[in-house]
Design a protein with these regions (language model features):
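Active-site nucleotide/adenylate-binding loops and adjacent lid/helix of ATP-dependent enzymes
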Residues: 1-12, 96-189
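ATP-binding N-terminal substructure of ATP-dependent carboxylate-amine bond-forming enzymes
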Residues: 1-102, 121-133, 311-316
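ATP-dependent carboxylate activation and anion-phosphoryl transfer catalytic cores
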Residues: 3-6, 111, 238-316
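Conserved hydrophobic "DFG−1" position in protein kinase catalytic cores
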Residues: 10, 196, 266-268
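Residue-level detector of anion-binding/catalytic polar loops
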Residues: 39, 85, 113, 180, ...
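Phosphate-binding site of ATP-dependent enzymes
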Residues: 162-247, 273-275
Length: 316
């Protein structure tokens, strides 16, 4: 079977907080694959998925459900049961990478820089009372802090706390998305994202993308609203810094056991250090997303999508 005759089923949408982004990602990938001569179809992640797989009989499945069950290994576990090759990490590795505290602990143990953090479950607040918990942890905290859900993406539920008053409201917001939250030391610097793809010869780091916003806060609106952010591709880095951050991204991709593609996010501080923030097993593919921008800087997003599908199809 030639590469161009491959049938690709793209799973997007679902009942997650990132549904809209997922649907837009799915449509863009489908268009890119069609441009390359593939038969591509987008289906919603709902109760009709099993029949869609049976009817379309894809050679490859590309899951693009962002957040929660789309990236925590749940969807990947279902796809394992189909016996059809799918794009992305295995269930165990997706689960590992999607849990930010666990991923940070593993990366930190390998000697790579990552900001200090603590992770807290909502159950702790219910049992001890929010005021008591915050009183116990505040003495050991240094503000400002970044408060975020322990899993999920698109910066949903993420905010910066400059003092104890901010911390309380920030945690309420984060807990509205996830039952576990992470308090992370704020590192001033530039947002740098490095996308990684697996090829025959091993992982390849695409050109780093730098994101600049007016208020320095790369939140949901800044990520998915045109003109809210300024992008530099490649990032404004020296040759040595470029090599360092790409090498770190590949190291993290391999350390977490990620497969096919990933996006590794860093903060570059004023001293030239790169601080690992998180790893994305199903990066956004919208017009303002970082993976497509890196792919276009390499050559062609359409061609990158095609190469990923062809690589995955070999696992059949």
């Amino acid at each position: 079977m030639s590469a161009q005759s491959l049938k690709v089923l793209i799973v997007a949408g679902g009942l997650t907080h990132e549904r809209d982004v997922s649907v837009r990602s799915g449509r863009r990938v489908a268009n890119s694959l069609v441009n390359q001569g593939f038969a591509a179809k987008v289906v919603d992640f709902d109760q009709n998925l099993p029949s869609a797989i049976k009817d379309f009989q894809p050679d490859v499945i590309w899951p693009l459900v962002h957040g929660s069950i789309g990236e925590d290994g749940s969807l990947q576990t279902l796809l394992e049961g189909t016996g059809i090759p799918y794009v992305g990490s295995t269930p165990a590795q997706a689960m590992l990478a999607s849990n930010k505290p666990t991923a940070k602990a593993l990366v930190g143990s390998a000697g790579l820089d990552t900001p200090g953090w603590i992770a807290l479950p909502q159950l702790l607040f219910r049992q001890l009372g929010a005021q008591n918990v915050l009183k116990m942890i505040e003495a050991g905290l240094t503000f400002p802090l970044v408060v975020k859900p322990s899993s999920g993406g698109s910066a949903l539920g993420m905010s910066k706390a400059y003092d104890a008053g901010d911390l309380r409201s920030a945690m309420v917001d984060a807990f509205s998305y996830e039952e576990h939250v992470m308090l992370e030391r704020y590192v001033a610097g530039r947002d740098i994202a490095v996308s990684v793809i697996d090829l025959e010869d091993g992982p390849l780091a695409l050109p780093p993308v730098e994101v600049a916003t007016d208020d320095g806060h790369y939140d949901y609106e800044a990520r998915y609203t045109t003109d809210e952010s300024e992008y530099f591709v490649p990032a404004r880095l020296s040759d040595d810094e470029m090599t360092d951050v790409q090498s770190a991204a590949i190291q993290i991709h391999e350390l977490l056991g990620l497969r096919d593609l990933s996006r590794i996010d860093f903060i570059a501080d004023e001293d030239g250090n790169f601080w690992f923030i998180d790893a994305n097993v199903s990066p956004g593919m919208t017009d303002t997303s970082l993976f497509p921008q890196a792919a276009e800087a390499t050559g062609s997003f359409d061609e990158i999508c095609a190469s990923i599908v062809e690589y995955v199809a070999q696992r059949a």
